[in-house]
Amino acid sequence: MNIAIRNPVPIRREEGSLQVGLDPNDRIETAKVFAVYGKGGIGKSTTSSNLSVAFSKLGKRVLQIGCDPKHDSTFTLTKRLAPTVIDALEAVNFHSEELRAEDFVVEGYNGVKCVEAGGPPAGTGCGGYVVGQTVKLLKEHHLLEDTDVVVFDVLGDVVCGGFASPLQHADRALIVTANDFDSIFAMNRIVAAIHTKSKNYGVRLGGVIANRSAGTDEIDRFNAAVGLRRLAHFPDLDVVRRSRLKKATLFEMEPTPELKAVTDEYMQLAETLWAGADPCEAVPMKDRDLFEFLGFD
């Protein structure tokens, strides 16, 4: 089959925006699906890749989908910049029936399968469309039938209709944040987007992952105020920086007691999510209320 734009299901209006519903044929029904969001540069790809490894070490069959045009979500797993779905399709003039799975799926560390959706050139096209077509291509090649866990690593904190598209496929959305004003402010906007999407889709907030932070006091205070919970805490350790330079996951680095505490935390997070994290019924703050709420007296 060729990949083509299908007629969208009826359009709904949600709080002043147009939302196109998910085609029921494109639902991911055979795996637990997590979408990882957070402020740009907060460490979503690091978190996603190490979480994927943790799931794989639980014996799960894992697929990680990078949803950033930079296509750098999975390089610590694959040790290279994987070809994107868009690159693969362009190579066959968008005749998807000519593609083989190995043209766009790369097996990474500990058997984690990796896909980089890629995206249109900067300032053109819709990244969300690319994500949707990636899922369709995976289904056409029956690659989701042998998968237990799908992890979407989503671009920055963009919550437009395009890059909110992984929420249409996800069971749980996870938010990566640091213990600072900018990260929590971005988290609140993501909570608002997920709150809106959950009215029409099955996605629910799974919780918050504290990253690159010595403490979690501001995160915990915000969580208590809006109805979120912290699932894990990963401090800002130099081994994280070194693992990225080495193009490796934390599970591949030279073991130390400090590093073991981090990998154990990832394993605990994977176990919690696999067991089924209860949804958080969070209600976002108004921007001005949050501005007054955060910080010290």
From Swiss-Prot:
<keyword id="KW-0067">ATP-binding</keyword>
<feature type="binding site">
    <location>
        <position position="70"/>
    </location>
    <ligand>
        <name>ATP</name>
    </ligand>
</feature>
<comment type="function">
    <text>Component of the dark-operative protochlorophyllide reductase (DPOR) that uses Mg-ATP and reduced ferredoxin to reduce ring D of protochlorophyllide (Pchlide) to form chlorophyllide a (Chlide). This reaction is light-independent. The L component serves as a unique electron donor to the NB-component of the complex, and binds Mg-ATP.</text>
</comment>
<keyword id="KW-0560">Oxidoreductase</keyword>
<dbReference type="InterPro" id="IPR027417">
    <property type="entry name" value="P-loop_NTPase"/>
</dbReference>
<dbReference type="InterPro" id="IPR005971">
    <property type="entry name" value="Protochlorophyllide_ATP-bd"/>
</dbReference>
<dbReference type="InterPro" id="IPR030655">
    <property type="entry name" value="NifH/chlL_CS"/>
</dbReference>
<comment type="similarity">
    <text>Belongs to the NifH/BchL/ChlL family.</text>
</comment>
<dbReference type="GO" id="GO:0036070">
    <property type="term" value="P:light-independent bacteriochlorophyll biosynthetic process"/>
</dbReference>
<keyword id="KW-0004">4Fe-4S</keyword>
<dbReference type="GO" id="GO:0051539">
    <property type="term" value="F:4 iron, 4 sulfur cluster binding"/>
</dbReference>
<dbReference type="GO" id="GO:0005524">
    <property type="term" value="F:ATP binding"/>
</dbReference>
<feature type="binding site">
    <location>
        <begin position="41"/>
        <end position="46"/>
    </location>
    <ligand>
        <name>ATP</name>
    </ligand>
</feature>
<comment type="subunit">
    <text>Homodimer. Protochlorophyllide reductase is composed of three subunits; BchL, BchN and BchB.</text>
</comment>
<dbReference type="GO" id="GO:0016636">
    <property type="term" value="F:oxidoreductase activity, acting on the CH-CH group of donors, iron-sulfur protein as acceptor"/>
</dbReference>
<keyword id="KW-0077">Bacteriochlorophyll biosynthesis</keyword>
<dbReference type="GO" id="GO:0019685">
    <property type="term" value="P:photosynthesis, dark reaction"/>
</dbReference>
<feature type="binding site">
    <location>
        <position position="45"/>
    </location>
    <ligand>
        <name>Mg(2+)</name>
    </ligand>
</feature>
<keyword id="KW-0547">Nucleotide-binding</keyword>
<dbReference type="Pfam" id="PF00142">
    <property type="entry name" value="Fer4_NifH"/>
</dbReference>
<protein>
    <recommendedName>
        <fullName>Light-independent protochlorophyllide reductase iron-sulfur ATP-binding protein</fullName>
        <ecNumber>1.3.7.7</ecNumber>
    </recommendedName>
</protein>
<feature type="binding site">
    <location>
        <begin position="211"/>
        <end position="212"/>
    </location>
    <ligand>
        <name>ATP</name>
    </ligand>
</feature>
<dbReference type="GO" id="GO:0046872">
    <property type="term" value="F:metal ion binding"/>
</dbReference>
<keyword id="KW-0460">Magnesium</keyword>
<feature type="binding site">
    <location>
        <begin position="235"/>
        <end position="237"/>
    </location>
    <ligand>
        <name>ATP</name>
    </ligand>
</feature>
<dbReference type="GO" id="GO:0016730">
    <property type="term" value="F:oxidoreductase activity, acting on iron-sulfur proteins as donors"/>
</dbReference>
<dbReference type="InterPro" id="IPR000392">
    <property type="entry name" value="NifH/frxC"/>
</dbReference>
<comment type="pathway">
    <text>Porphyrin-containing compound metabolism; bacteriochlorophyll biosynthesis (light-independent).</text>
</comment>
<keyword id="KW-0411">Iron-sulfur</keyword>
<feature type="binding site">
    <location>
        <position position="160"/>
    </location>
    <ligand>
        <name>[4Fe-4S] cluster</name>
    </ligand>
</feature>
<keyword id="KW-0479">Metal-binding</keyword>
<keyword id="KW-0149">Chlorophyll biosynthesis</keyword>
<keyword id="KW-0408">Iron</keyword>
<keyword id="KW-0602">Photosynthesis</keyword>
<feature type="binding site">
    <location>
        <position position="126"/>
    </location>
    <ligand>
        <name>[4Fe-4S] cluster</name>
    </ligand>
</feature>
